[in-house]
């Protein structure tokens, strides 16, 4: 995203910060029996107006941000405010349709729309041995956000990582650029598309 923005926006002062949502499975930090999605986000961000950043520096930034925030203490603080709001006497008696409008307004202000995309990695999928002969590949498709046209789901099956890029716009520039970066890194890549 940084390289593509540099290519499209020549003046560094006009470039926007790049922020990616990385979901974190809270079940690993807080034992839970719920079947519902129990996740929070870590949002590494880089401001290109502060100067160039190498790929290695970017990887280090994400690694350290994940290390600092992916723990019980930080995650508990993140969702404590949500739990506290549920206990508010005013909110408890408020009609649901008003709560829904308020929650949408809050989400639009501080939610996913404040990022460039969400990159969710399920990791390596393991299946029972009896199922393995019947599975050729895995895909992980996540929907796009209302105000950010790209999302990316990653899953590994066997020795292959499947990276599913989803977009709500016609232009595949980000995907093309991502392919070029992987190719430049010397990684074997096979591209598939459902575009007609």
Regions found by a protein language model. Give the residues of each.
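Acyl-thioester-dependent acyl-group transfer interface
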Residues: 6-196
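Short amphipathic alpha-helical segments
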Residues: 1-2
